[in-house]
Amino acid sequence: NGLLVLPEDARVGADVKPILGMDDWIFDIAITANRPDCQCIYGMAREVAAVLGKELKEPALDYTADDVKKENFKVSVLAQDICPRYTAHYVHDVKISESPAWMRKRLALVGIGSISNVVDITNFILKELGQPMHAFDYSYLEGEEIVVRRANDGEKIVTLDEKEFELNSNNLVICDGKKAVALAGIMGGLNSEINDGTTEVMFESAKFARDNIRKSSRALGQASDSVSYTHLTLPTKLEV
């Protein structure tokens, strides 16, 4: 209803920022083209640690492999010249909900609105590690496979922002067994969007050729946060 409920002990006239947990610092840093590794929080933290001679706190990257396996599912990359690496991880028993307050706050501080717990995870990783990701609703993926290929001339896709694009062989697409489900490195397709009823998710993390993604983005007039990260060359440790 648009009302903000404050704690009962909130004092009239007091600064509201500490009450809302907003008494924080935001660094607005202009990154030059030769330092894409500083485009994310991890990269910037590494740089600051080196300058100050401090120990870098590595992010926790451990997970249980059994939680992300899907039997009989396969990934085929038919355009390795513009997609040298593609990984897909399956997660089941998912419940779409609101992200925890701390994650919503951190995303808001970097200008990203919260959508859902699953989508917010991909955006959080983008800003923390500089790795673009995408999440597909697995129930909409046909044929139990992901195929990374060049688009067919005249092939069409409707992206998450409900825009339809006619593609050609210069465009890289992510497909299931029958159809295109994402514009690689640019935006996912509406036909596999995460929704409130999603219970199975396929997470994508990949390395795409920056020149191809940049040219496709410009030719189609379709930009996104993923494009701004994909078209930069990142150190191997920060990829995928």
Give the predicted meaning of each segment.
Residues 1-234, 238:
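RNA/tRNA-interacting regions in translation and RNA-turnover enzymes
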